[in-house]
Amino acid sequence: MKNLSKDFGVEINNFDCSKEINNDEVEFLRNTMQNKHFICFKNQNLDGNNLAQFTKNFGDLETYPEKDKTKGKLEIFNVSNVSEDGEHLSPNDQRVILQKNNSRWHTDSSYRYYPSIFSILYGQETLPEEAKGGQTEFSNMLLAYEDLPDDKKILLEPLHQVHSYNDIRR
């Protein structure tokens, strides 16, 4: 296991997410997520079935009624500019528009009554590291808050934030 930064994220090598994992491994991964908030597993070869099976180790999965879910897998939300039949989607396609909105800062499923504990992303096809675009970034909002000066925390204490699914569709 390699730290990706001092306080946030680890890379775990030689771990096959397509294989069944035991309770000790589940507990180790759950604890690592809770302490480091982000795990990167490189060089995975997953299909919809074993991706869903791996994620079910951590709890019930959300389902997605939207038309851009992965074919036959209600629990896998497909983020792509390519349709199921391999055609590039038009810039005016509703799925492309929604994904452009997701390119802004957001927290997955924060608008749900019971928000997700984890989000698991699997890149089937990604750009080379030197390419522009396609970079997903992660942040540790707990650490960001802890690092605030006390006067800022006092200012934020009485405030409430609303995360709305409808707002991202504007």
Task: Show which residues each predicted segment covers.
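Non-heme Fe(II) oxygenase catalytic core, chiefly the N-lobe of the double-stranded beta-helix
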Residues: 1-170
